[in-house]
């Protein structure tokens, strides 16, 4: 599995890309690298882009361990939002499972999106659902 972490200066969020074949060990390293990157600040909005990640071998135990690993980093996260970008239905379903498990213990909102534009809008408060929720 490969990954890249970039700061989107125009929109003020961190974007982490993954590609290749999923492994739980790589996922833990990926999450660690996000929160130890030069760009990370507590409370920074985060988009995790799974569009180029092969998820065919992911099982429930992998989702659970990834969620537990993220929960252990809760103190580094701070309040804010995490958008999961998943461009196919299998990725989206796995993302929703991860969301439901992680939300139990995280102090952050998590949402899953098919569209990068919708994910960015939600992260930056420009998405219709974000505006409606603030009313």
Q: What is each residue range found by the language model?
A:
Residues 1-135:
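Amphipathic, Lys/Arg-enriched alpha-helical "gate/interface" segment within cytosolic domains
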